From Swiss-Prot:
PANTHER family: 1-DEOXY-D-XYLULOSE 5-PHOSPHATE REDUCTOISOMERASE, 1-DEOXY-D-XYLULOSE 5-PHOSPHATE REDUCTOISOMERASE, CHLOROPLASTIC. This is 1-deoxy-D-xylulose 5-phosphate reductoisomerase. Signal peptide: none annotated. Pathway: Isoprenoid biosynthesis; isopentenyl diphosphate biosynthesis via DXP pathway; isopentenyl diphosphate from 1-deoxy-D-xylulose 5-phosphate: step 1/6. Belongs to the DXR family. Gene3D superfamilies: 1.10.1740.10, NAD(P)-binding Rossmann-like Domain (3.40.50.720). Its cofactor is Mg(2+); Mn(2+). InterPro entries: DXP_reductoisomerase, DXP_reductoisomerase_C, DXP_reductoisomerase_N, DXPR_C, DXPR_C_sf, NAD(P)-bd_dom_sf. Mn(2+) binds at residues 153, 155, 222.
């Protein structure tokens, strides 16, 4: 428990996987939290239910088409209803102590910047794309205003907790589950369907991030995120495949010792930590029983089968890293959407990203607004690349 009065909290992306974890924590601990705003993309029914359950001051749907439904569902309550970009930005301007940012994709970038400017004390960040595309521009804005970014990704939350004890590390290792195709051959992956890619063996995640895990683009983005969040040189970041997803990160120190953070693979645990930070949560999470696992497995990633993993390092080492990171993220978002819509094959995704990075990672990006503009350019060019590809026969 906080024992310091209730913390005012908003949740962006409250109807998604991480958002629902946050809502459950807020529901279970009403003495610790006051809910100011809940923001969802389009699920008006679940959002309205959450707003009533948590007595939220405000509920916003990003899709204008869902506004009337949300307004009708909350008629007779004291909940203020909003919609569209204006509604999301209004929610991000409200006076809160902490905000959970669980919106998917680069759509979170401008709300994160608005939160930073609004004077929020901490952001529980479950969106890596805003850091990938905002880079040091976003990190510096947070530092200048005294905003603490507490990552919710299990790997980065682990690094955050480890470095809080001793930040003088030599190397950091991020673990990767390997996704659903860890032991598939390239030939087998030629026939991957969206339903195959969405069937993650360990984590329950949204559609986009599930595909990212399957291609291992997710880990490429996490390498970039770790670089910016913790000021780590790309050469000091390693990735190790760990199918059990029990060890989330390892920090190696100059004296030859290493410290890891371990827990059961449950996103509620880092979400709980980020919501209560800087206090320690005393509510019980899932307990790790190592003996029940018998053994833990670690292996080197296979870049021949999962070339996308290397894209994060390539982007950071390029002559125009900001542009390269934006191109990587934009191309991936477009390609994943095309794959989920049965327009391209699974193995087309890394090829499309590589082509986009080769063609587009070549300009200066000097502001958040320029990052947004360049993202749109990259998306348009990536759609052109997608349009040149024929849909694989197995998808028809």
């Amino acid at each position: 428990m906080l024992h310091m009065g209730r913390k005012r909290v908003s949740v962006f992306g409250s109807t998604g996987c991480i958002g629902q974890k946050a809502v459950q924590i807020l529901r279970d601990n009403p003495d610790d939290f006051e809910v100011v705003a809940l923001v969802a993309k389009q699920d008006a029914h679940l959002l309205a239910s959450q707003a009533r359950l948590l007595s939220a001051n405000m509920a916003v749907v990003a899709e204008d088409a869902a506004y009337e439904t949300l307004r009708e569902l909350l008629r007779g309550t004291c909940v203020e209803v909003g919609a569209g970009t204006a509604g999301v930005m209004d929610a991000a301007s409200r006076d809160v102590d902490s905000a959970v940012m669980a919106i998917t994709g680069i759509a979170a970038l401008h709300p994160v910047i608005r939160l930073i400017k609004s004077g929020v004390k901490s952001i529980a960040l479950a969106n890596k794309e805003s850091v990938v595309c905002g880079g040091e521009l976003l990190i510096n804005a947070a530092k200048q205003t005294g905003v603490n970014i507490v990552p919710v990704d299990s790997e980065h939350n682990a690094v955050f907790q480890i470095l809080a004890h001793d930040g003088c590390v030599a190397r950091v290792t991020l673990t990767a589950s390997g996704g659903p195709f860890l032991r598939w051959t390239r030939e087998q992956m030629q026939a991957v369907t969206p339903s195959d890619a969405l069937a993650h063996p360990v984590w329950k995640m949204g559609r986009k991030i599930s595909v990212d895990s399957a291609t291992m683009v997710n880990k490429a983005l996490e390498v970039i995120e770790a670089h910016y969040l913790f000021s780590l040189d790309p050469d000091s970041i390693d990735v190790t495949v760990h199918p059990e997803s029990v060890v989330h990160a390892v920090a190696a120190y100059p004296n030859g010792t290493s410290i890891s953070l371990m827990s059961v693979p449950d996103m509620g645990i880092p979400t709980l930590h980020a919501l209560y930070w800087p206090q320690s949560a005393t509510v019980c999470g899932s307990t790790l029983d190592l003996a029940s696992y018998g053994k833990l497995t670690f292996m080197e990633p296979d870049l021949e089968r999962f070339p996308a993993l290397g894209f994060g390092f390539e982007a950071l080492r390029s002559s125009k890293p900001r542009a390269a990171c934006i191109a990587l993220n934009a191309a991936n978002e477009v390609a994943v959407e095309a794959f989920l819509n049965f327009e391209i094959a699974f193995l087309d995704i890394p090829n499309i990203i590589m082509s986009a990075m080769d063609k587009l990672a070549c300009c200066e990006v000097n502001s958040i607004s320029e990052a947004g503009e360049y993202d749109l350019i990259c998306r348009a060019r990536t759609r052109e690349i997608c349009d040149t590809l024929k849909v694989s026969e197995f998808i028809r």
